Amino acid sequence: VRVLHVVTDMRRGGLETMLMNYYRKIDRNKVQFDFLEHRQEESDYDREIKKMGGKIYRIPRLNPFSIHYKSTLYEFFEEHPEYQVVHVHQDCLSSIILKAAQKCGVKVRIAHSHSSNQDKNLKYLLKLHYMKKIPKYATQLFACSEEAGKWMFCVADFDVLNNAIDAKRYIYSSEV
């Protein structure tokens, strides 16, 4: 099974490191992670992903107003029917990607909340509009905590998927 993770990029942020912690530990003979990145430049984890057998695809930056962005997204899903599991990590704007995946026949569409709030600026109202649509297009809702799930999915049912942390890296060492 190939799972397509939709991310901004694979730099060394919290979400990206969590995904890599899972990726390093899964049985890659049974499940393979591929990544759809919204940046054109290479990211920190890209080489490691490729070494482990993952593929990296690039599309333009996520822009809810761009016809070019949306057509590129639809083209991607139409050209890659092998992806029957799409796991989207795009916060409030995940519904845009989930809708395209649904219309192109992707059977399992996961939205994942990684935060429990959003800056209350001018963009917030727009993001609320898209956030409310997430449960309509997702088949599964995940959150890193109860708070993150309640914030992003409101009253919809979601599952908490705890962040993968390599605890051995944080064990006390007298040598340090």
Annotated model-derived regions:
Residues 1-176:
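Membrane-interface segments of envelope glycosyltransferases acting on lipid-linked substrates or membrane lipids
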